[in-house]
Amino acid sequence: MEIDKTKVLEAGKIASQVKTYARTIVKKDVPLLEIAEKIEARISELGGKPAFPVNLSINEIAAHYTPSHDDKALASGLLKVDFGVHIDGWTADNAFSLDLENSEENKRLIETAEEALNKALDIVKLDIAANQIGGVISETIESRGFSPIINLCGHSMKQYELHGGITIPNIDDGRKVVLKEGLYAIEPFATPGSGKVRDGRPSGIYELTSEKSPRSPLARELLQFIKKEYDKLPFCSRWIVEALDSKALFGLRELEANGNLHHFNQLVEVSGAKVSQAEQTILVEENKVTVTTL
């Protein structure tokens, strides 16, 4: 399928505006639920839709923390803000990190991830090998005394598919997969720790993987709602409660047990060390590369 460049660029423009807005509302001790709801509302106000639930991951949690509908957690520490915007399934994915405890190490980690991202963006072109990008990322991060997260990667994106099949590693993994024309997210993670993540607690973030019919009418109705509202893009239990009610959580559990949904885990740095993240989306064309989320 041919990329709808107009929608890709518009999604990126909205993401950029929301990123500027998000930086103004994220403060220490603000409820994460409030931050997520405000970011998602701003996306909708500007004419887009959230491509996935806002991730607000603190310290050693590298990714996949989104507030539940009754979440009480407050913003603190080294906070990663990762959100996406889509227009008819064409996505802009971006992230930034904030130091909410005035820590020199946090600031260095944030600067390191941003520098690694910028150096990666500088070399991206049509037909570049993804592992070459990963090599630049790891060299940059390691030169500042930190480690890249080796089992988290950037990714290609397709319409209604956040992960489109091609990965962009954060190290030189030796796999010479080249970037063709398309949409990609590049996202370095830096840590003073071991440089790997493990599965943590269930995140409340889901993705539709099968349309086989469940038993109960409640679950069947919820399955149709998910297909219509989210297609193959990730969603969360909080959205389901907001759109329907808390009874729908029973249907969600049934769909998970029936194999209709993949339930993502939070991703936690193995040694318990803090993690920073930076991310932008790029559109690779024959003669140019556009960072859509700037």
Question: PLM ranges: what are they?
Answer:
Residues 1-294:
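Active-site neighborhoods and metal-handling regions in enzymes and metal-associated proteins
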